[in-house]
Amino acid sequence: GNQQKVMLSRGLFSDPDVLILDEPTRGIDVGSKYEIYTFMNQLVDEGKCLIFISSEMPELLGMCDRVYVLNDGRIISELKGSEITQERIMDDILTDTRKRAKNGANSKSKENEN
């Protein structure tokens, strides 16, 4: 937890308007997570923009006012406010996966026709 807090502090040294946080709470205890969440909220209150990358659904649901859902490295949806639910995120991923699988199957059958 201390290493993440030091990295956050170092990132703020140049007073950026935008801060990218990639999995800032991965592998740390609950107390340290709470401290980092509090710190992130303070930054937002100061007008900073945080790009928060996380694979932990509860973090996204609890911390974000906008979520970009990615699947296989591509943005597949943008959710705001009350749209940000676990069900919606999972539905968007499943819908995209099915669509891509169907398109892949269609292109393979077209190749077989030739």
Where are these regions (language model features)?
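Glycine-rich phosphate-binding loops of nucleotide-dependent enzymes
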Residues: 1-114
